[in-house]
């Protein structure tokens, strides 16, 4: 029996005894950051490039929001969403131990653990990327505060106070297709939303 699979870099019918492994989700073909690009499911390559540019241009500098609709990660015992896990690689920092905050600085947070040892957790301080962007973390805890292991210590400009990836603003939009071809589509937004963007 033939199954549709990926063989020699092409999607084609494959005999079942030739299959070496199976992916749980089609999104597993792409990495964490590639899955953030809008229009990734498009069958036309140029649309994928448009989407990556659109995302870069659409990111607000301040007051970003986590998505209203999030996808849970299969098999995650804590019930975290894709955006929760992505936030961990977007500059947010968590406490490795329970203890008391001794010091919060611009580049690290120091914790006196319940084990009596000091733990220094580095955070990003205007860390520059190569394309006119940077990542900056800001502590969400204060000196003298008690923290538990796994509690968020610092958020970044790409996450919210809970450490969830927050890249944009939630909006109700209208999609206006061009002659039904879905190639030169337009997106209509409200005046109120336009004011929120500025």
PLM feature spans:
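Long, charge-dense accessory insertions within large macromolecular proteins
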Residues: 1-138, 148-198
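Metal-assisted phosphate- and nucleotidyl-transfer catalytic regions
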Residues: 141
């Amino acid at each position: 029996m033939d199954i549709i699979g990926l063989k020699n870099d092409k999607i084609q019918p494959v005999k079942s005894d030739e299959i070496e492994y199976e992916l749980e989700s089609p999104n597993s073909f792409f990495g964490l950051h590639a899955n953030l690009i809008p229009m990734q499911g498009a069958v036309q390559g140029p649309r994928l490039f448009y989407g990556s540019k659109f995302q870069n241009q659409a990111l607000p500098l301040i007051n970003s929001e986590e998505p209203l609709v999030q996808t849970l990660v299969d098999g995650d015992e804590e019930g975290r969403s894709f955006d929760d896990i992505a936030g961990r690689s977007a500059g947010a920092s968590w406490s490795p131990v329970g203890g008391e905050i001794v010091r919060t600085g611009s580049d690290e947070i120091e914790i006196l653990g319940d084990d009596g040892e000091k733990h220094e957790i580095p955070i990003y301080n205007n860390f520059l990327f190569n394309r006119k962007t940077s990542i900056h973390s800001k502590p969400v805890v204060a000196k003298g505060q008690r923290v538990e292991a796994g509690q968020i210590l610092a958020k970044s400009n790409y996450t919210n106070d809970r450490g969830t990836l927050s890249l944009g603003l939630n909006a109700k939009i209208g999609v206006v297709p061009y002659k039904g071809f879905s190639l030169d589509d337009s997106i209509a937004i409200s005046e109120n939303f336009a004011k929120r963007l500025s």
